[in-house]
Design a protein with these regions (language model features):
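N-terminal glycine-rich anion-binding loops that anchor highly charged ligand groups
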Residues: 25-31
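A cytosolic small-molecule/anion-sensing beta-strand core signal
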Residues: 20, 32, 53
Length: 178
């Protein structure tokens, strides 16, 4: 569902797929090739949200910020299932694991991996090319080239999968065509 709220309207610049059960409201910009999956909520009612090119916001993720805050997701980012991004910035090619939480003002660098279930506290900076895990999240190592390549592959795989879902035929329609 796309909706205007607080005088702000989402801008779709060519998303590959936005699920019919996703909610995209307010000051949200969807860049070309991005995908927003089932049950995801992207609320740009309090501040602007930009979803980068080929970035995927997976099922049941929530993106929102406090008044005056903003969210910027770079190109080729993966926001895992059930993750929460609240007023944060995520750099190009990074992966935020399932059920991870990013709090206000934190910055995740380029080509980073945030482990599943991690909590990145307010204002924390995760340097480029690192892996951070835990509660609170701490950097444990440099991201191996294979890990960052896999994160990039994941982003492209979700663009392609999104196109498949966008072309899907609902079962009721398929049955009536028989």
């Amino acid at each position: 569902m796309f909706a205007s709220v607080c005088g702000k309207t989402p801008c779709d610049e060519g998303a590959a797929f936005v699920a019919d059960t996703a909610v995209v409201v307010g000051d949200v910009t969807l860049k070309p090739g991005c995908t927003v999956w089932y049950g995801a909520v992207i609320r740009g009612d309090e501040g602007p949200i930009v979803i980068g090119e080929n970035t995927n916001v997976q099922d049941n993720a929530v993106l929102h910020c406090d008044p005056g805050g903003q969210i910027t997701l770079g190109r080729d980012v993966t926001i895992g299932h059930g993750a929460i991004v609240h007023g944060a910035e995520v750099g190009e090619g990074s992966l935020v694991g399932m059920h991870a939480t990013l709090l206000n003002g934190c910055k995740v660098g380029r080509h980073c991996i945030i482990g599943a279930g991690a909590l990145v506290p307010e204002g924390k900076v995760i340097p480029d090319g690192t892996v951070a895990v835990g509660v609170p999240a701490r950097v444990v190592k440099d991201a191996a080239e294979a890990q960052t390549a896999a994160a990039g592959y994941n982003a492209i795989a979700y663009v392609n999968l999104g196109r498949e879902h966008a072309a899907a035929i609902p079962l009721e329609s398929a049955k009536s065509e028989e």
